[in-house]
């Protein structure tokens, strides 16, 4: 069974230590609930990932584990076969011992867009909410973060993350917990909190912003990326049914409306640092994710629209600061 003991040890003498009052019971329940099903099968695959520590580990400009010279071609093929069991791979790319995991998303492009606007991550304790398989977590570590914690309830994402971590070296200060943010107590401890590609999946977006705020220390930085539409501060799209074939998209605000939401949630220094239309080159089907992708979600006669007739995906990134506690919002 995947163990979280190294995480408990890591936070025992940190600003997160009070989390130990509740977290082991929550994760213990998760482990009991996943004794059967696909997780045990995936854990058998993880247990086969016995490879030497990589001769190189590049996290600053990419996520590259090993130079490709340590393994024979046969060993590389065996490793690739094991990693392919965890398909579909959505967020990346990763390079592992010469194997290029060409994921659905070019998540490195998003990182390059937002990185210049971040407060330095050096020595920071960072939370990535809805982290997927953890690609951006590794890039955060590459920027010098002291400890990176990701949360995502997906068992597949957890196993993909564990595979990469075992190949990179399990001593790395980076951990993924199979939790949703609603399972976190108000920790008031993280220097930086990321929420990228999550807000539009929340039935109550203001509550999500308040949950993010509750994880930050006072003066900590929120990095929020979500789908937006054009319009003024009163413009919000509520899809009637599906959006881009997704049935779990609830609210798409304009950038101006989202700024108001952040202000309502008692953030300050609110600024929109990037707005980008998702391109067919950034999100596409690959050999590692052979299912439908963005091109299948757009109107074939007009890629500025989804198949339902809504504006095509456009993503805005906001950065904001947690204000001093406001008793009216507690």
Swiss-Prot record:
Any Pfam family hit: Methyltransf_9
EC number: 2.5.1.-
Reaction(s) catalysed (UniProt annotation): carboxy-S-adenosyl-L-methionine + 5-hydroxyuridine(34) in tRNA = 5-carboxymethoxyuridine(34) in tRNA + S-adenosyl-L-homocysteine + H(+)
GO biological process, one term: tRNA wobble uridine modification
Quaternary state and interactors: Homotetramer.
Enzyme class name: transferase
Protein task: Catalyzes carboxymethyl transfer from carboxy-S-adenosyl-L-methionine (Cx-SAM) to 5-hydroxyuridine (ho5U) to form 5-carboxymethoxyuridine (cmo5U) at position 34 in tRNAs.
InterPro entries: CmoB (IPR010017), Mo5U34_MeTrfas-like (IPR027555), SAM-dependent_MTases_sf (IPR029063)
Entry similarity comment: Belongs to the class I-like SAM-binding methyltransferase superfamily. CmoB family.
Binding-site positions, carboxy-S-adenosyl-L-methionine: 91, 105, 110, 130, 152-154, 181-182, 196, 200, 315
Protein name, UniProt field: tRNA U34 carboxymethyltransferase
NCBIfam families with a match to the protein in the record: PRK15068.1, tRNA 5-methoxyuridine(34)/uridine 5-oxyacetic acid(34) synthase CmoB
Keyword Transferase annotated: yes
Gene3D superfamilies named among the record's database cross-references: Vaccinia Virus protein VP39
Species name: Shewanella woodyi (strain ATCC 51908 / MS32)
Cytoplasm listed as a keyword: no
Record keywords, A-Z: Transferase, tRNA processing
GO molecular function: methyltransferase activity; transferase activity, transferring alkyl or aryl (other than methyl) groups
């Amino acid at each position: 069974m995947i163990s979280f003991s190294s995480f408990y040890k890591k936070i025992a003498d940190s600003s997160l230590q009070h989390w130990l009052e509740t977290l082991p019971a929550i994760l213990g329940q998760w482990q009991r609930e996943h004794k059967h099903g696909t997780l045990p099968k995936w854990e058998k695959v993880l247990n086969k990932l016995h490879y030497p520590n990589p001769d190189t580990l590049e996290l600053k400009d990419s996520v590259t584990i090993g130079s490709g010279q340590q393994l024979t071609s046969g060993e590389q093929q065996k490793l690739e076969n094991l990693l392919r069991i965890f398909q579909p791979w959505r967020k990346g790319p990763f390079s592992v011992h010469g194997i290029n995991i060409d994921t659905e998303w070019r998540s490195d492009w998003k990182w390059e867009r937002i990185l210049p606007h971040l407060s330095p991550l050096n020595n920071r304790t960072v939370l990535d909410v809805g982290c997927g398989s953890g690609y951006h977590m590794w890039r955060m570590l590459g920027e010098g973060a002291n400890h990176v914690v990701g949360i995502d309830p997906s068992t597949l994402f957890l196993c993909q993350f564990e595979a990469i971590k075992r190949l990179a070296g399990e001593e790395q200060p980076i951990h993924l917990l199979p939790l949703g943010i609603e399972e976190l107590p108000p920790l008031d401890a993280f220097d930086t909190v990321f929420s990228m590609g999550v807000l539009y999946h929340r039935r109550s977006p203001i509550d999500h912003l308040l949950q993010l705020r509750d994880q930050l220390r006072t003066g900590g930085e929120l990095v929020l990326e979500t789908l937006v539409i054009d319009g003024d501060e009163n413009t919000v799209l509520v899809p009637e049914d599906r959006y881009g074939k997704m049935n779990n998209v609830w609210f798409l605000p304009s950038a101006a409306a989202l700024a108001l939401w952040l202000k309502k949630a008692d953030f300050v220094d609110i600024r929109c640092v990037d707005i980008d239309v998702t391109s067919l080159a950034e999100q596409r089907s690959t050999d590692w994710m052979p299912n439908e992708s963005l091109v299948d979600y757009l109107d074939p006669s007009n890629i500025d629209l989804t198949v339902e007739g809504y504006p095509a995906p456009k993503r805005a990134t906001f950065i904001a600061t947690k204000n001093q506690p406001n008793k009216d919002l507690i």
